[in-house]
């Protein structure tokens, strides 16, 4: 279990400068502020449900699906409920299937692929195989449904948030710690980007910045 948590921390540690919270690190650091203020700003970005808070939303959505889909192996019933979620008629009314889609990855998110492997092993060890395969079915159905409903012409894959909440749950980590664990891992990446910003000593970043 310690190995799985270690892998999760490594996968969340850094993911380039294009994500919202890391870009926040660059923007705030460019003003010349101190490290604590820059990291605090990045934390504010990360906690949002469309960013680092998505793993908690995936977990809550998964519990909602388990309660409302009677036969977890019935793909028709599962598909119909996922459509309700997308049509804002179920779960939190956002129309989002959390943990699906990424700005860069389409075919697969390598972080999710690695975490899924460990999730499967943990689920087998803890007697939660049925739950794992339900999550797996959601993953395989959701991509096509999202593309169809949103009229998108690209593949949509699960991102790292899709399986991280499931892994944390199996490890008996409480929900309120999901996003803080993400932050603990990502601070190393934020600090690296802050150092990069300070070393380059560039102009203050503004909306028209190039």
Q: Where does each model-flagged region fall?
A:
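Non-transmembrane, aqueous-exposed alpha-helical and coiled segments at domain scale
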Residues: 1-210
